């Protein structure tokens, strides 16, 4: 039964991934092993998918797969979009995850697809440094997505305060990508009447739970809509968007629930 499942999955994977059949077959076994074992421990996975092989032989085969086979991110992304039942438009999210592995800093910048409050990474960069991603790195991931799928299906790009920048906003406007990005409350904007003012000053009269929207403001050289809410614990939360500003706070709250 397991051999049959591996064969079936291998045929599906061969439609999306390049490489010889043996490697694709090993990938199929690893995927089924992950689902069966519920762990990323390679030794445990080997027990679930060893078929007629000895445990040690299967373990070495899986190790060799990860050592010798480099996955193409475009192929991974295409496969993810195939297996996720999303017939409508896509919500993208910028995220960054970092942790320490011994003395090494692991710091990944990710472009993910939102699905049922889960962010599924499709493109990523190992920053190999501490701190945030650069404009070049943000636009690099967006261009990868554009080249593979285009932006026509994108309904929104969500991101936290660290991601917004002059160059990113200009790129999103140029490519007509809908976005909802949180901004810092000390940003300076120019109102439609030409008045320069700090974001926190323009929304300082908000009561807890109250939402306010300002349209056609200029932020970092781009025309944006600002939507703000005052929270009891967190204080002022402001997002910049280029579409449906009345729903921007709700859209961003969805981003905060994504894992």
Language-model-derived ranges and their functions:
Residues 105-111:
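Short glycine-rich loop/turn motifs
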Residues 81-82:
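Short, compositionally biased leader-like segments
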Residues 42-52:
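DNA-recognition alpha helix
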Residues 89-100:
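Two-metal-ion RNase H-like nuclease active-site motif
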Residues 28, 42-43, 59:
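Short amphipathic alpha-helical segments
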């Amino acid at each position: 039964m397991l051999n049959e499942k591996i064969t079936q999955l291998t045929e599906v994977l061969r439609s999306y991934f390049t490489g010889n059949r043996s490697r694709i077959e090993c990938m199929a076994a690893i995927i089924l092993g992950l689902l069966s074992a519920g762990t990323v421990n390679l030794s445990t996975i080997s027990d679930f998918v060893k078929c007629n092989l000895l445990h040690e032989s299967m373990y070495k085969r899986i190790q060799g797969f990860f050592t010798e086979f480099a996955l193409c991110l475009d192929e991974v992304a295409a496969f993810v979009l195939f297996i996720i039942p999303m017939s409508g438009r896509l919500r993208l999210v910028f995220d960054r995850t970092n942790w320490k592995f011994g003395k090494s800093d692991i710091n990944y910048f990710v472009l993910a697809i939102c699905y049922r409050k889960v962010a599924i990474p499709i493109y990523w960069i190992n920053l190999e440094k501490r701190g945030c991603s650069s404009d070049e790195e943000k636009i690099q991931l967006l261009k990868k997505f554009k080249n593979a799928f285009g932006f026509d299906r994108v309904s929104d790009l969500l991101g936290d305060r660290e991601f917004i920048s002059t160059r990113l906003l200009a790129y999103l406007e140029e490519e007509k990508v809908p976005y909802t990005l949180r901004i810092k409350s000390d940003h300076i904007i120019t109102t439609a009447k030409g008045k320069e003012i700090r974001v926190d000053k323009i929304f300082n009269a908000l009561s807890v739970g109250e939402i306010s929207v300002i349209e056609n403001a200029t932020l970092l050289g781009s025309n944006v809509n600002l939507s703000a809410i005052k929270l009891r614990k967190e204080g002022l939360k402001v997002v910049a968007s280029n579409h449906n500003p009345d729903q921007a706070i709700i859209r961003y709250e969805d981003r905060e629930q994504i894992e």
